[in-house]
């Protein structure tokens, strides 16, 4: 039996390799392995918890310099005194807010998820982006189409 989904995943993985984006390639290869093995029974759990776990891992990576001491407290304090750092703080707040709207939109309008995923994979693979795009993209879409 011909598996169109597997073919799409292989194509996206190839796109990841061609564009030298190991994040996309490895992620898709892991999903292919899950799909073609008995691990496929975990897909409902991955679909339900994967985003939360990914955000936790991303947050750990972002907070690691503070926890390790690489980013000293004095630097954090000075970030409130430099205009560029204040801009970075404001942008961080806005992007976090957009991500929150994105999570809501993805839950309430699942028909938009496919477009967001394709756009994110293309952005990661072709433009060396990072796969945090679906949440922010969904947040931007929510500003245009509404949360509903």
From Swiss-Prot:
Family affiliation: Belongs to the UPF0756 family.
Keyword Ligase among record annotations: no
GO CC, any one term: plasma membrane
InterPro entries cross-referenced by the UniProt entry: UPF0756_TM
HAMAP family: UPF0756
Cell membrane in keyword set: yes
Residue stretches spanning the membrane: 14-34, 51-71, 86-106, 121-141
Protein name, UniProt field: UPF0756 membrane protein YeaL
Domain of life: Bacteria
Bilayer topology term: Multi-pass membrane protein
Localisation per UniProt entry: Cell membrane
This protein's UniProt keywords: Cell membrane, Membrane, Transmembrane, Transmembrane helix
């Amino acid at each position: 039996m011909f598996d169109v989904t597997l073919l799409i995943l292989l194509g996206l993985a190839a796109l990841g390799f061609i564009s030298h984006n190991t994040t996309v390639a490895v992620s898709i290869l892991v999903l292919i392995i899950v799909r073609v093995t008995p691990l496929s029974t975990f897909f409902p759990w991955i679909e339900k918890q994967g985003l939360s776990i990914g955000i936790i891992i991303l947050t750990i990576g972002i907070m690691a310099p503070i926890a390790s001491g690489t980013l000293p407290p004095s630097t954090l304090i000075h970030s409130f005194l430099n205009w560029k750092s204040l801009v970075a703080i404001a942008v961080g707040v806005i992007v976090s807010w957009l991500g929150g709207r994105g999570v809501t939109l993805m839950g309430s309008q699942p028909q938009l998820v496919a477009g967001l995923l394709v756009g994110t994979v293309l952005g990661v693979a072709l433009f060396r982006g990072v796969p945090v795009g679906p949440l922010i993209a969904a947040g931007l879409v929510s500003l245009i189409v509404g949360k509903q």
